[in-house]
Amino acid sequence: MELNTIKPASGAKHAKRRVGRGIGSGLGKTAGRGHKGQKSRAGGYHKVGFEGGQMPLQRRLPKRGFKSLTLKYNAEVTLADLQVLAADEVDVPTLKQAGLVGERAKVVKVIKSGELSKKVVLKGIGATAGAKAAIEAAGGSVA
């Protein structure tokens, strides 16, 4: 086999459909568009979601919720994440280097999920009441 001899399998390629080229082709005159109406005209078609004048689905359904603009800057870390983290002093840059929070995170909070048995000192990071109690019970502190 050589590159200049490769061909598609027979029947795999179809000739382009030529419309409006006489009645013998089966697609002459109206070219498969039917008779009259908006869809038969040049440049004539409805917008996406148009339901013939009926109130469209995207307007019939109620709006719900909103997209928080601060969400991308806020992050949370669990006690289990702190347990596997090698550092004893934890701040936002440390968490970013470890890949526990995103690069754009500005505010980080520790939540009580999982167990913590080692001493951890938090600097510039908030903690929920339960997480703070667990950190202090393990000998750590929240600054």
Curated annotation (Swiss-Prot):
UniProt keywords (A-Z) are: Ribonucleoprotein, Ribosomal protein, RNA-binding, rRNA-binding
InterPro entries in alphabetical order: Ribosomal_uL15 (IPR030878), Ribosomal_uL15/eL18 (IPR021131), Ribosomal_uL15/eL18_sf (IPR036227), Ribosomal_uL15_bac-type (IPR005749)
Query: What does the record give under GO molecular function?
Result: rRNA binding; structural constituent of ribosome
* Top-rank taxon: Bacteria
| GO process annotations (BP) | translation
Comp. bias regions, Gly residues:
21-31
Q: Which SUPFAM superfamilies match?
A: Ribosomal proteins L15p and L18e
Task: Keyword check for DNA-binding, yes or no.
Answer: no
Q: Which GO terms describe its cellular component?
A: cytosolic large ribosomal subunit
**Pfam families, from UniProt?**
Ribosomal_L27A (PF00828)
Start and end residues of each stretch annotated as Disordered: 1-51
NCBIfam families tied to this protein: rplO_bact
Describe the function of this protein: Binds to the 23S rRNA.
UniProt subunit comment: Part of the 50S ribosomal subunit.
Q: Which family does it belong to?
A: Belongs to the universal ribosomal protein uL15 family.
Q: Return the HAMAP family for the record.
A: Ribosomal_uL15 (MF_01341)
What is the name attached to this protein's record?
Large ribosomal subunit protein uL15
| Organism of derivation | Methylibium petroleiphilum (strain ATCC BAA-1232 / LMG 22953 / PM1)
